[in-house]
């Protein structure tokens, strides 16, 4: 498969866009970061012990389908887990990343997001960390969320302002 952008600036060809490195990611915001699918799967995320299957009224299934599981295929799970694939900055510098977390998030808790930050720091990669104080998981969901008790206007908009400031600084 070849990359075919759905948008190109009027004055530039695809070749010119590529030559100017305009397709490169310049900065990234990671929200509700799933950085370690291997560890998550080992901790029963793909079983009924994960409350999300109950809430979704769905049958548990593996992230990678029926054939693969984290016990028999740890390398595959680690291959899709960013925390195991961070290059040293001397080999390849990643774009700056904003890692976001919420104080009361029990699904992607602050400590989990900070673990990814530690891994980035060990590889000398640039990142910033921001914690949305006294907020639950899913603070960016639109409208109001009954289970988390979030309201997008109260909880999401302040988070988006932090994210936009990050992009303004790096783009």
Where are these regions (language model features)?
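Surface-exposed intrinsically disordered loops and tails
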Residues: 5-10, 23, 65-68, 144-153
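C-terminal catalytic histidine-bearing segment of alpha/beta-hydrolase fold enzymes
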Residues: 96-100, 107, 111-171
């Amino acid at each position: 498969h070849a990359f075919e952008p759905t948008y190109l600036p009027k004055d530039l060809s695809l070749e010119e866009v590529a030559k100017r490195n305009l397709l490169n990611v310049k900065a990234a915001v990671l929200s509700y970061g799933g950085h370690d699918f291997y560890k998550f799967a080992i901790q029963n995320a793909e079983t009924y012990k994960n409350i999300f299957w109950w809430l979704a009224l769905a049958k548990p299934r593996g992230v990678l389908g029926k054939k693969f599981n984290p016990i028999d295929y740890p390398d595959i799970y680690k291959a899709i887990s960013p925390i195991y694939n961070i290059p040293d900055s001397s080999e390849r510098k990643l774009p700056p990343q904003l890692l976001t977390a919420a104080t009361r998030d029990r699904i992607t808790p602050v400590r989990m997001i900070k673990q990814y930050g530690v891994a980035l720091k060990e590889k000398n990669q640039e990142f910033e960390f921001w914690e949305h104080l006294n907020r639950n998981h899913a603070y960016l969901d639109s409208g109001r969320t009954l289970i988390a008790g979030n309201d997008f206007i109260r909880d999401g908009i302040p988070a988006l302002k932090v994210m936009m400031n990050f992009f303004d600084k790096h783009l």
